[in-house]
Swiss-Prot record:
Keyword line: Repeat, TPR repeat
Chain positions of TPR repeats: 49-82, 83-116, 121-154
Protein name, per record: Tetratricopeptide repeat protein 36
Organism domain of life: Eukaryota
The organism's taxonomic lineage, starting at the top: Eukaryota, Metazoa, Chordata, Craniata, Vertebrata
Gene3D superfamilies the UniProt entry points to: Tetratricopeptide repeat domain
Record-linked PROSITE patterns: TPR_REGION
GN (gene name): ttc36
């Protein structure tokens, strides 16, 4: 499973103006959904796969992407029907500039997750971000909508940014606030004399 830290890395790359470390959330429902999905696997093999993923995340945090990808690939080979390692490898591939490979892994993660739990939500968010970077806003919007339905606040923020009407309203509001601050092109001076009494005393 992606840690908040390695998700924040991707978040910072795509969204440098958004506060760092607020990429995605996990709740009790997510934990239960993940437990249900992981219950299909042998506990011993599952533990090995999770250990490999942790090693991969540590390597990625040390900027050793080659080792990270190797560890995630080993986890996938061990449990090819588990979505989490595809998610993690997709992020490492994206950080290496392999967008095609990242999208292939994310497509697989979405399918394997059944569009549920943390793995499904994170795959949709990551894929949506890549699609948005590629200018495929309609496809990105669909992924963000599904991720939002799974409880991702970050996906909800992306949907607002992709809404042309919201963008227009934001522009109009900004212009209106600017006019209120500077009526007739003149800035309002705080503490400026405005009363007749003040004028007479001047």
């Amino acid at each position: 499973m992606c840690t908040p830290n390695d998700l924040a890395v991707l978040h910072a790359i795509f969204n440098p103006n958004v506060p760092f470390g607020n990429f995605d959330e996990q709740n009790v429902g997510d934990t239960e959904a993940n437990a249900d999905l992981d219950g299909r696997f042998s506990s011993a093999i599952l533990q090995q796969a999770q250990d490999l993923e942790r090693d991969g995340v540590k390597a990625a945090e040390s900027e050793d992407m080659a080792t990270a990808i190797l560890k995630f690939s080993e986890a996938i080979a061990l449990l090819p029907e588990r979505a989490s390692a595809y998610n993690n490898r997709a992020q490492a591939l994206r950080l290496q500039g392999d967008v095609k490979g990242a999208l292939e892994d994310l497509n697989q993660a979405v399918e394997l997750s059944g569009i549920a739990g943390v793995a499904g939500r994170q795959a949709l968010v990551q894929r949506g971000l890549i699609l948005r970077l590629q200018g495929k806003d309609d496809e990105a919007r669909k992924d963000f909508q599904r991720a939002a339905q799974l409880g991702s606040d970050f996906a909800k923020q992306q949907l607002i940014l992709l809404n042309p009407y919201a963008a227009l309203c934001n522009t109009m509001l900004r212009d209106m606030m600017q006019k209120l601050r500077e009526p007739n092109g003149h800035k309002i001076q705080v503490g400026a004399s405005t009363s007749l009494e003040d004028d007479r005393e001047a």
